[in-house]
Amino acid sequence: MSTKKIMLKSSDGKMFEIEEETARQCQTIAHMIEAECTDNVIPVSNVTSEILEMVIEYCNKHHVDAANPCSDEDLKKWDKEFMEKDQYTIFHLMNAAYDLHIKSLLALAYQTVADMVNDNKWAFE
């Protein structure tokens, strides 16, 4: 069975093809699909290609189906490694998760920042 694909366009114009079911993890995109207000391309105007690529990677990993079995322990380990990024990137991932309404990524980003603050690894400038 082939899955429906949609195209996402980042703020800097780069195009990404993603499975619709994976994209539905982004509540903003899911609402656009349900309201049929998408042509062939969904603009993601507040997210650069660099960050959108990471968001898609996260959504692909967290997309649950028979083809993607993953234990909770494996997923937690993957999440921890995924968030090993600089403050700038974490901040932009957090904003993208907020704009796209990806609750699990937003919670992960918030927890990462809280852990960094508690461990004195967050630079306040």
Swiss-Prot record:
Keywords: Nucleus, Ubl conjugation pathway. One of its GO terms (biological process) is response to auxin. It is found in: Nucleus. Restricted to siliques. The keyword Nucleus applies. The keyword Nucleus applies. Its main location: nucleus. Coiled coil: none annotated. Pathway: Protein modification; protein ubiquitination. InterPro entries: SKP1 (IPR016897), SKP1-like (IPR001232), SKP1-like_dim_sf (IPR036296), SKP1/BTB/POZ_sf (IPR011333), Skp1_comp_POZ (IPR016073). It holds the Pfam family Skp1_POZ. GO terms for cellular component: nucleus; SCF ubiquitin ligase complex. Residues 94-125 are annotated as: Interaction with the F-box domain of F-box proteins. Part of a SCF (SKP1-cullin-F-box) protein ligase complex. Belongs to the SKP1 family. Involved in ubiquitination and subsequent proteasomal degradation of target proteins. Together with CUL1, RBX1 and a F-box protein, it forms a SCF E3 ubiquitin ligase complex. The functional specificity of this complex depends on the type of F-box protein. In the SCF complex, it serves as an adapter that links the F-box protein to CUL1. This is SKP1-like protein 7. The gene is ASK7.
